[in-house]
């Protein structure tokens, strides 16, 4: 993502994305995410602030480890038109199918306010 290059083959065709974007639908599909990425990368540069620390996910019903992954990270976003930057703390999780492709992706951050702060 930081290289403005997302390998969309890592996602199932029917993947569901859920995030915290003000005004966006409750869930987004892969084509919608591709469009959002295209617009975003046209205006912003991204830098991850540290290596990712992946954590084993847990099934909320059983309390047992499952095939999901969670992670916390910080991403610096720079508006290329004015040079302003913000560091956004993000929590993200991925659930995978038997083929190892992401079927559900969710993230939590104050994304909308953070991006607005660098406009």
Show the residue positions of the predicted features.
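C-terminal and inter-domain tail/linker signature
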Residues: 1-119
């Amino acid at each position: 993502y930081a290289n403005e290059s997302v390998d969309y083959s890592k996602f199932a065709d029917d993947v569901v994305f859920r995030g915290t974007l003000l005004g966006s639908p409750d869930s987004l599909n892969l084509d919608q995410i591709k469009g959002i990425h295209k617009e975003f990368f046209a205006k912003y540069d991204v830098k991850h602030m540290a290596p990712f620390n992946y954590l084993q996910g847990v099934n909320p019903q059983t309390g047992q480890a499952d095939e999901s992954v969670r992670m916390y990270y910080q991403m610096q976003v720079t508006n290329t038109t004015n040079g302003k930057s913000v560091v956004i703390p993000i929590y993200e999780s991925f659930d995978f199918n038997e083929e190892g492709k992401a079927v559900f992706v969710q993230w939590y951050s104050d994304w909308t306010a953070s991006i607005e702060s660098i406009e």
